[in-house]
Amino acid sequence: MEFWQHIYSNFNVIAFSIFGLKVHWYGIMYDVALLLALLLAKFFVRKFQLDINEKHLYSYFIWVEIGVILGARLGYILIYDANTMYYITHPWQIFNPYINGEFVGIRGMSYHGAIIGFLIATLLFCKKYKTNPWIFLDLVALSVPLAYVFGRIGNFLNQELFGRITNVPWGIYIDGVLRHPSQFYEAFLEGIVVFIIVYLARFKQSFQGELILVYAGAYSLARFICEFYREPDFGIGFVLWGMSMGQILSFIMFITALLVYICIKFKKVNI
């Protein structure tokens, strides 16, 4: 257990270097997550015989990836970053992967910002190709949660988004302070548990779009719980009634998903 508690003291966030370019474990985990999401999407298209051809699926993932990156980065800057005004006046720095001449990748991403970017990209894609967005959204609800697990593992390997101070034996030392390995809590609850819920819901699905709403509700609830063990974002802290910004956004997300679900399922709103 002692090795685990001091794992950050014996671990390098850089996996290897290629011609002087440092490749971080976080980047590797991000690529694994993206590839897994695509493979799972292809699997579920075949398994449930969805009306999505492979060409459209590949194109859709490209659109969504662009939307997610833009939304995640802009969302972080507008919601969490303490230097928002700097980026507004220096927009070319938003996606600058270098700090003092060293390649460090793009740091600072917001999940809730990624959701907005993802939804916008989906709507634009489906409008261009005249397809039903709910089919793609339900597919994402099935294919993303397990891939999300690797994203949180990437956060752990990158030594970021760590937990609150604790005395549990499985805690890890960060700057000499024992903290919850909250990234793994999130990987389990927001990834594995959410996937199980959405997958089971698929077999009782009563309308298109139900799975993405189930995903939104399940994820936001899981995230709300995990935030109790995760250190509040630097520079923001607790925002309202002892809640973090992540909890407030998750609460809004949960209520929105619940209201849309009720309107569609019980009021027979056409989608």
Curated annotation (Swiss-Prot):
Location (main, coarse): membrane
Transmembrane spans: 25-45, 60-80, 103-123, 134-154, 181-201, 209-229, 235-255
Chain sites annotated for binding a 1,2-diacyl-sn-glycero-3-phospho-(1'-sn-glycerol): R152
Enzyme class: transferase
GO BP annotations listed: lipoprotein biosynthetic process
Domain of life of the source: Bacteria
Pathway given in the UniProt record: Protein modification; lipoprotein biosynthesis (diacylglyceryl transfer)
Location of this chain's protein in the cell: Cell inner membrane
Membrane topology: Multi-pass membrane protein
One Gene Ontology cellular component annotation held by this UniProt entry: plasma membrane
Keyword hit for Transferase: yes
Keyword terms of this UniProt record: Cell inner membrane, Cell membrane, Membrane, Transferase, Transmembrane, Transmembrane helix
GO molecular function ontology, one term from the record: phosphatidylglycerol-prolipoprotein diacylglyceryl transferase activity
Role summary: Catalyzes the transfer of the diacylglyceryl group from phosphatidylglycerol to the sulfhydryl group of the N-terminal cysteine of a prolipoprotein, the first step in the formation of mature lipoproteins.
Family under the similarity heading: Belongs to the Lgt family.
Name listed for the protein in its UniProt record: Phosphatidylglycerol--prolipoprotein diacylglyceryl transferase
Organism of provenance: Campylobacter jejuni subsp. doylei (strain ATCC BAA-1458 / RM4099 / 269.97)
Lineage of origin: Bacteria, Pseudomonadati, Campylobacterota, Epsilonproteobacteria, Campylobacterales
